[in-house]
Amino acid sequence: MNKELPKVYEPQQVESRIYQMWEDHDCFKGVEDSKKKPFSIVMPPPNVTGQLHMGHALDCTLQDILTRFKRMQGYAALWVPGTDHAGIATQIKVEEELRVKEGKTRYDLGREKFLERVWKWKEEYGNRIVQQQKKMGVSCDWSRARFTMDEGCSKAVRETFCELYDKGLIYKGSRIINWCPHCVTALSDAEVEYVDKPGHLWYIRYPLADGSGDIVVATTRPETMMGDTGVAVNPNDEKFKHLIGKKCILPIMNREIPIVGDEYCEIGFGTGAVKMTPAHDPNDFEVGLRHNLEVIRVIADDGTINENGGKYNGMDRYECRKALVKDLEEQGYLVKTEPYSHNVGTCYRCHNDVEPLISAQWFVKMEPLAKEAIRVVNDGTIKFVPERFTKTYINWMENVHDWCISRQLWWGHQIPAWYCDECGHINVKRDDPTECEKCGCKHLTREEDVLDTWFSSALWPFSTMGWPDTTSADLNYWYPTSVMVTGYDIIFFWVARMIFSGMEQMKKEPFKTVFIHGLVRDDKGRKMSKSLGNGIDPLEMAEKYGADALRFNLITGNSPGNDMRFYVEKCEAMRNFCNKIWNASRFVMMNLTIDHVALPEKLELEDKWILSKLNTLIREVTDNMDAFELGVASAKIYDFIWDNYCDWFIELTKNRLNSDDPAARENAQNVLCYVLIETLKLLHPFMPFITEEIWQALPHEGEFLMLSKWPEYNEKFCFPAEEEAMQTVIEAITAIRARRNEMNVAPSKKVHYTVSTANEASFTAGIPFFTRLASASDVTIVPADAAIDADGKVEVDTHAARIFMPLAELVDFEKELARIAKEKANAEKQLAGIENKLNNQGFLAKAPEAVVNGARADAEKLRALIEKLDASAAAMKK
């Protein structure tokens, strides 16, 4: 016999037990099968330092839905999990712990001992996010869990670095890079976030060396002027072109610098003359190369002014700015100051201002790599969903700069380069060298810098599959992966780099589709952040409402590429949906006497209606899933379960379930159970826990719902005529119920309905449903053109019928109209009070936003009530 479900669904008790059952039976394992098509996903590896946040929860849910869907469709499915070593984030975390607990810095320990601490920290805390992901129900193959600094990934990183270096695609050189003085490391262009900040334009007078006058420049960064080695003007600028070739005096430093002509200068911006600081501005650097200007760096790694800054040496860059502006003013060089808002580069990690400065770093030469990465997207080999992100990606790749890959950290993949102490030659080797390949010297010093974290992440789709072992069975079966699910905020950080790395190392795209999702924002549309204190812990939501409710909340209404707002109230609504499914399933089981589900040959009208509806749902949901329209699919499943199955079909079958005819009872049970099981399959990828728990209690074939066959559209369940017929009956019953409710007619009061319709057959078949669901004492069906005595009757119209109800005998119209008038007057009085508040500008300005929004919502409710009362009164006056 079938199991009995408890009266109340308790997700906290069910979820951990179900997940353990799946794990114990290797349900998540990806197994190569030559008879099956492969479907593979590699998880964007969360930081090993991390805790699950709403972005992770959405990301994991989307990937899990796709993986479960494909697994049920019969694909060999593999979802590879893993974590990222997260260079800066992890090092900062461990350094902070070291400082707080022991009062030490990493330098006190030394590199080797410090790295031992980081590995120990990783072993202690690194599994935390994995356990949190499991609570979300993710069906990863945990036996394949990877780490971006594990042995396999480290081997792939070293092989890639050496290959690119040997091809001339990695080089070391001095260029302008983004430097974070707080994290004390270089950053790539993608790691710089630009923030609009208020600032100033300072107009400074540079005297001409020949004493014939001066040239005025405008700058937002006077603190770099000690490193000025020229002033540039546009050669087409009539105001300045006579000065080209002359020299001027750098104020404060009293150094002669040349005036050069370059079209980089924008006529009309500021004064038209621009100070050139090649060591601290990428554009100035390029101008400097064209005019052979000296490069003088004045800002040190820690953001202070260095020895080239004269008397400002040792000052913080912004303290220097204040002091310098004061000195310029006192010495008569400051012409004027204007407020000016401009974009300032900030570090994506610590959000401090980034300093552009000249530095010797390691770079990846991007132009040759970008060509193939652009081609595979342009020709459709890789598709972006939504398609609009294709343009975002192409625009970035077409304008990409060389990638700065060296970081001044200890935690990470140490660059495999050794400097010869004798001749200075750089030895880049797959295995640690013992002597210089150029001069044979035995004394080599290893590069101290590590690689950008994203360098190892860029190899993730193939390093997790066994590369650089090209004979790897995993690599040959699962690569390229099927889809990459990620947020639009890391298209440049990660997606682009995976694409060019895959094309360069594998000569094949790393994935076929890039499925982009947006950010999860708070209910006001703000980005969740610690500073705002508006973050919502997904684990708290899962604990309170169940992981299924959280997952469904994140998916319903979510559309690819768009940000979504998270409403806690919606979690509660989704928990109610779980309860609705649970209670419906309990009802079905309480009425089950069958041990095996088989659809009867003879189907009733309501059976054909629900089977036809289900058939359409299967086709549409499958199409939506294939098109990555997961939010649309989930909404359709929700509507079908709540409206069609629970609110209607269960009610429509109750006459048969209570019948004295055993065959009628069994037929109803079979259809109820069949539709429930097929619907649970459709819902399973979205709500895996509750669906598995219910399915296990129902008559079923196979061991697990998650491994069962995905429903398929079946022509034999197309019943368009019956579906339309049943729909007309449902529409009529709905309209009758609404009118009875408006007129306060108790459900217990039976009414004789007269139905005037051209569709007599449908309504005749539906008479039993009117009796049960519309409190009908009797139903008379007449042709649409038949004469009707409407005296004392209320008319309800639908698209297929006119329905007459003799409610005069049931309702005291005079008394009911008086009640309605009184209720309406009270509602109008309340509405007037609220509208007075909302028209008061003082209230709108001073009251909290939540209070104002609450007042607006109350006003809308009262307007709706007044409209409903008017409709009820009008119906009685007909």
Can you name each region flagged by the protein language model?
Residues 100-116, 383-384, 539, 560-572, ...:
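Short, polar/flexible loop-turn hinges at active-site or ligand-entry regions and domain interfaces
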Residues 183, 253, 350, 421-423, ...:
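Short Cys/His-rich metal-coordination motifs, predominantly Zn2+-binding knuckles/fingers
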